[in-house]
């Protein structure tokens, strides 16, 4: 019986694993020879994007704990200021635009505290799971892996795949794609 996961990042990872197979389940095959390379670039870019809102989520909650009596207006100002700081540090060098507030668009950070980083970690976990699942019996492995229950994240992924939880496989795959 499937029995819990270490945290919501692992739930997101499993959702990503199944989403990857949605067209396949409908009998639609993508024969594009560049598909694997494009998938890797897409995963890296998606993680880069969600990391920004994840950092903002964490920063906003740190700010709220430091300012427990803040008004809604002060929170709004802080969210906008923090989003600009994160944008300017991590995104402006890539996009060439400063003081963008697009990272502040996610209302999740208030309604579902500290959830957004689960997406970024979920993508790292998914990448490791996909590498492991490649060429194996999907149903049996998913059943085996997700029966482990609520272990610490690194113990869980190590028992699932034999490797520590790390972004290294993603970076290695990206380097390979960029070389080609």
Predicted regions, residues:
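Post-HExxH zinc-binding segment in Zn-dependent metallohydrolases
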Residues: 5-45, 122
């Amino acid at each position: 019986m499937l029995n819990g996961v270490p945290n919501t990042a692992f739930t997101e990872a499993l959702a990503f694993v199944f989403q990857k197979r949605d067209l396949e389940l409908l009998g639609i095959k993508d024969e594009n020879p560049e598909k694997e390379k494009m998938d890797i670039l897409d995963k890296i870019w998606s993680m880069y994007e969600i990391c920004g809102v994840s950092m903002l989520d964490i920063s906003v909650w740190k700010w709220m704990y430091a300012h427990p009596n803040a008004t809604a207006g002060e929170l709004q100002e802080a969210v906008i200021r923090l989003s600009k700081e994160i944008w300017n540090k991590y995104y402006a060098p890539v996009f060439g635009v400063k003081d963008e507030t697009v990272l502040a668009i996610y209302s999740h950070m208030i309604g579902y505290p500290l959830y957004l980083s689960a997406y970024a970690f979920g993508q790292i976990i998914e990448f490791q799971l996909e590498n492991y699942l490649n060429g194996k019996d999907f149903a049996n492995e998913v059943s085996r892996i997700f029966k482990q229950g609520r272990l610490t994240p690194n113990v869980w992924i190590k028992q699932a795949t034999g490797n520590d939880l790390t972004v290294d496989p993603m970076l290695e795959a990206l380097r390979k794609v960029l070389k080609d």
